[in-house]
Amino acid sequence: PELALLLKRIESLREFLECVKTSSTFDGETKESVCSELVALARAMKPKIVVNRARNAYEAQIAANIFAKHARQNLLIEPENLGYMVFDNRVSETINSGMPLVVSYPKLKISQCIADLASRLGYF
């Protein structure tokens, strides 16, 4: 029950681990076991970042860096930056027309971003 209460009020894994370590409810071995298992689970996660609607690569990199920093600090994980999707008004048009963007506008920067992402994910 104490763990459930902690989970409701704590916002980061780092905070949660600190509460477990300082809790008087658990013995030392249990504290160590819970903390090491949670850290191992967090490190096993391999989240990926794709920044959407960025104006350029520089803006996307800044956003990805900020997100990655918070993921490291609060979740103890290191996300991989896969790239970005550049903002383009024609995305809405093509969605409404029912035609794939990369077919309608293959030379647009957004189409190149989609191809780059597909390549990084192993689809090409």
Regions found by a protein language model. Name each.
Residues 96-106, 110-124:
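A cross-taxonomic marker for long C-terminal extensions/tails that follow the last structured domain
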Residues 1-21:
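Phosphate/Mg2+-binding loops and adjacent switch elements
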Residues 59-63, 94-95:
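Short, well-ordered secondary-structure micro-motifs
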Residues 33-46, 74-77, 124:
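A structural motif corresponding to the C-terminal end of an alpha-helix
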Residues 42, 57-60:
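Short acidic/glycine-rich loop or secondary-structure boundary segments that cap or lie
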Residues 24-35:
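A general structural motif
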Residues 64-68:
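Charged helix-capping and loop-helix junction motifs
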Residues 44, 51-55, 71-101, 114:
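Beta-strand-loop-alpha "switch" segments that mediate conformational coupling across diverse proteins
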